[in-house]
Amino acid sequence: GGNDSMYGYANIASMLLVLITAPMLGALSDRSGRRIPFLVITTCCCVFLTVFLGVGGLFPALVIFVGANYMFQSGLIFYDALLPTVSTERNRGKIGSFGVGVGYLGSLLGATMGILLLGSIGHIGMFKVSALLFLVFSIPCFVFVKENGSSKYLGSRLKALRGSVNQLIKTLRKTREYPGLSRFLIGRIFYADAVNTLI
């Protein structure tokens, strides 16, 4: 059951959660000096939730979708932050562009595969296949990407979280020094959402 508007509301809810928590998550990973552990956690949570999409009725499915999409979008924060680790200043633009292009290609291939398999395994089966492929294609990043930096903050989780909040506040105050930055970030949110909707 359900309709497109229900999916839209669920998507908005998950993106609002990302919007609220993303700066804190980014600051937390910066203070820890590590991204892979956070990426592993968000990816595994997303995979786990995706497996159960479509099971248990409409409302549970929407709630699970909110959680899965939140974990996926949060994982992108840590994934994107790995770019300096896998590139140099000279080739960073090329590496980043190549990664984005391959990602969009993967989306097209995934959609094509979904069209071919949907009739035989159904929507619920497609969610399970998507979860499996997401996990499989994430493993090389977990295994082969080696971060150079060590943890910069060895205190308790509570202290790390408090420090991240303080760092976030300082960063937000500094945005006043760059008038165009806030407009760019807000525009980026709507641009990225439109692109994701298109693909």
Model features per residue range: what roles?
Residues T85, S138-S156:
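Helix-loop junctions on the cytosolic side of multi-pass membrane transporters
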Residues C45, L49, G56-G75:
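Hydrophobic core of transmembrane alpha-helices in multi-pass small-molecule transporters
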Residues I64-V102:
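Cytoplasmic helix-loop-helix junction between adjacent transmembrane helices
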Residues Y7-A27:
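Central cavity-lining transmembrane alpha-helices of secondary-active solute carriers
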